[in-house]
């Protein structure tokens, strides 16, 4: 129930005026300045977005953890973009490498045009169903109970397992934002923070 404060990393560029989105162009130097300023001012996490115009959130966050000491990376994840077994392994590896400096921001996708352009042209309901399966698979693989089977609408696994084990027990925090009834239901079941 602790209050947390986070900041947003503008990986498509920053601005002093919202109407000019890339007034300050994106660069590794700008990202490091922003994340270090957030850390130095006591923010617990920095949100790295995922969108076509943004720099890759996973690679950017991996580099930024090396430039900081304690701030957590809140990496956005959308359904259908990364195989859930690989996603679970990526998160567990990141979690171990940084001693728990990762959280996941679940996004069902608010931009249908971008989803279709990137090959994930599912309905909103299907995106939420797929995201639910991906979260259940990640949690199942992180449970440490051995081989994991899953029989869902989108994913079917037989004897799946990953290494390394997750650092944060039982698993990292999941965040979810959204005002729809689907978002509220999903958040109540699977997210730590809404």
Feature locations, PLM:
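Acidic (Asp/Glu)-rich catalytic clusters
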Residues: 36-40, 62-70, 91, 95-102, ...
